[in-house]
Amino acid sequence: MLLPTGKADGLFVAANGLVKALQDKGAKATVFRPFDVCKNAKGACSCSTYSMSKCEAVKYIANGQKSELIEAVLANYNRLLKDTGADVVVVEGVVADRFDQNEINAAICLALDADLIPVSIGACKKAHSMVRIAMGYFGDSGKDRVVGGILLNEDAPRDATGRKKLVLAGKSECGCNSSCGCSGSKAPEAGASCSAEGKCPVTMLANIPYNCKNYALRASDLASFLEGALVGDENVRVCGVSFDAASAQEHEVLITATVPASTNAAVVVLCDGVEGPAGKATICTKSSVWAVAETFSMLPAVIYSDDNERAQSSGEFAAQFFNGELVASLAKVCAKEFPLMSPAAFRYKLTELARAANKRIALPEGDEPRTVCAAARVAAAKIAVPVLYGKKDAILAVAKEQGVSLDEGVEFIDPEDIREKYVPRLVELRKSKGLTEEDARALLQDNVFLATMMLEANEVHGLVSGAVHTTANTIRPALQVIKTAPGASLVSAIFFMLMKEQVYVFGDCALNLNPDADQLAQIAIQSADTAKAFGIDPRVAMITYSTGKSGKGPDVDLMTEATKKAQELRPDLVIDGPLQYDASVMPDVAAQKAPGSKVAGKATVFIFPSLSTGNTVYKAVQRSADVVAIGPMLQGLNKPVNDLSRGALVDDIVYTVAITAIQAGQQDK
């Protein structure tokens, strides 16, 4: 990811140049621009199919929807990756003055698990401080992501605000003008890099000079800036200005208040309302010569994303200044041994997998306000088909109170209409317990039990409850009717912990009080399989207060035995223990305490010795680190049933429905 430090307004050229340099080395590279200008010079939207307009991004941020914004960026990125099949993607960081660009760039970088290339304007010495400021948004992990830097545009002309401007006046040996600061005629020095005194904090991949030819305007661009009428070739380009028809050159624009008899100018601007054909392109405006000249003094040096010719030529120009050896090594450097699953990427993956599963999920607490709001979002996003239990009129009244709409994609079930249907089947399933029809009718008064019977009959594909019911109320019917899955000796519960850079799996944090070694081994295996199913590379740490053989005690012995059993049962999984939590997640601690471990320092799945430990750690991490925890997700049932915290937010319910739909889809395979 090219990370702008300050107003690095040559990012478009730098990104195109790096892509071209990578392609020259045989890489299948492309560029991804998360945001693009709202409109091009013609006033039309110039965003590519993979970019969001900056105006739309501002709306997301103004509405407090930063997470949704990053997920939308991820969706565009994944479509680009799928359509292009690129093995290297150069992400162009965001330069913006309407929101905190450093904060958004950090969020995008972490979501994509991208490496960083800081891009700075000016000499390397000045760039040092700019890089440090920008990297401050990435925390301790930022320095490990930097793979090089780029310097650019030190000699570009700028306006009073520091914005790069296009100077169209006079002539120079480069064929442009005398004051443009252009390096276009200079032979590029391949691999030009930082020459500042002292040690540079990053290896410079390129030092790209300014070239005004990269920003040569089209006649259509000029017409838009001048708000004039264009006749002729809209794509003819200019990089100079003349006020004399006789001396005007073919690369210049002639500004005049009279129709010239003849001129070599590429574009003629007729002022004061004068009209008539002249030059390859003619722009007619009611403005005076002086006003037009004033407008030309304020032209920004930009390349619009719809200007394919300039995009290509600017990339070819910039590519000459990249160090070939360093560029060749970039693809290898960026290939990660242990790629991270960021929270944004995880949420996006949940949504996509759930949509693909296309399942009906029972929500027995159908008139509970948070559940109603979640159902509306689930249906709108096509995550699943929510099935709400209760009187339809009452549910719709709640929806109206909450300001949401339950339209197409939401189903309603009135329990009174269907309870009797499931009495015989429930009696049959519980006959060994002596259940009578009267008992069955009493049990089916509970909507959770009723929904569980529908799940058993394959009339819905999963069940989510717990917003107002206890965990026991949610799980007991499933254990009595659904039973455990083939090969599962117990049901366990995990939480997905959405840490800043990586999603972890914590288990068991909700069900098993004091599991023995065999049960812990099963929990470890179930949790590893769950992690893998949700796109997380499982590296399982069996957690206790000691690492390896450094300590003694019942929990150490328990986790040592559980680790051995899990490894024997599933040699294909990466499982290690006992490990302390810090040794599991911190590479420097792991290097000291468990240097030979394949898990220490890079664990993604954490198995705790007891419910007391697991629940305490999950809540401590959730609250102290302000981490989103999704779950508990139940493992080991024959069909997916998931419990909610009674303090669950609407987001929690939405993602729990998504998880349940994904589980249902996996059970079909």
Region roles according to the model:
Residues 337-600, 605-669:
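Anion-binding alpha/beta catalytic cores of soluble intermediary-metabolism enzymes, centered on
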Residues 1-282, 286-335:
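Flexible phosphate-sensing "switch/lid" loops adjacent to ATP/NTP-binding sites
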